[in-house]
């Protein structure tokens, strides 16, 4: 098990106050699940610590642990500490999130990550700044702004296709667009995923996902709404 040692404050709900400090923003996030084991959100170490202190963690798992160091007990001379695991299930989350959509929110850079930064028409790989969210069936012709009608396209290919379908433009799609699963969405939106978190999420990714190709951890990025 890999252990991270961090000093942090502002927990409030803890029985023993922790000394002043700051979590490194480059530290990986904690994967928060509901009580049924479904992923719900990425949280920082401070939020995870608050769940532990309130007794709201139903169960946890993972090969990584984060140790938060607190104040020193005057009587014993021992320093308080709180150990967080990299994956935590939060009590009450299942009921609170009933009816939550299983389809990830459509974000431009998550689309590019789904498509592995590859243009659907020429097959080139590009930076996010050089890609566009391209509607297979143009919106002006009734095409929807949904995952299954969007592909990543470089700017020249997008301009060449214009307001036509791929068939009309003579530009065959190199891959088929699809709607990511709930688990896949969590991978696409985080660029700093620990190996145990990745293994947990990949277990819920359907076989047709392109994340089953090489290096799924390389797809994370910063996100902008489409």
Which residues does each PLM region occupy?
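Short helix-coil boundary/hinge micro-motifs
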Residues: 1-103, 171-226
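Short, flexible, glycine/charge-rich loop motifs used to bind or transfer phosphoryl groups or to couple energy/partner
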Residues: 20, 108-110, 143
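Short coil/turn motifs at beta-sheet boundaries
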Residues: 23, 112, 145-147
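A generic structural motif
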Residues: 36, 144, 157-159
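Short Cys/His-rich Zn2+-coordinating modules
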Residues: 95-107, 133-141
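Short cysteine-rich loop/turn motifs with clustered Cys
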Residues: 103-131, 151-157
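Histidine-centered nuclease catalytic patch
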Residues: 123-152, 161-177
């Amino acid at each position: 098990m890999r252990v991270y040692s961090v000093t942090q404050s502002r927990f409030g709900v803890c029985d023993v106050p922790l000394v002043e400090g700051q979590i490194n923003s480059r530290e990986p996030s904690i994967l928060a699940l509901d009580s049924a084991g479904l992923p719900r959100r990425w949280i920082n170490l401070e939020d995870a610590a608050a769940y532990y202190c309130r007794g709201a963690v139903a169960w946890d798992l993972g090969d990584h642990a984060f140790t938060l160091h607190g104040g020193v007990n005057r009587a014993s001379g021992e320093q308080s500490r709180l150990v967080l695991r990299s994956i935590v299930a939060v009590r009450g989350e299942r009921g609170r999130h009933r009816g939550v959509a299983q389809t990830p929110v459509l974000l431009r850079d998550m689309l590019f990550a789904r498509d592995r930064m590859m243009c659907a028409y020429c097959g080139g790989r590009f930076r996010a700044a050089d890609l566009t969210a391209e509607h297979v069936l143009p919106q002006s012709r009734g095409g929807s702004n949904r995952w299954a009608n969007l592909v990543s396209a470089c700017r020249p290919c997008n301009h060449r296709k214009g307001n036509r379908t791929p068939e009309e433009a003579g530009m065959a799609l190199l891959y088929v667009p699809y709607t990511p699963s709930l688990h896949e969405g969590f991978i696409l939106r985080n660029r700093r995923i620990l190996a145990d978190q990745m293994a947990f999420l990949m277990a819920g990714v359907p076989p047709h996902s392109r994340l089953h190709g090489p290096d799924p951890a390389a797809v994370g990025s910063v996100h902008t709404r489409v």
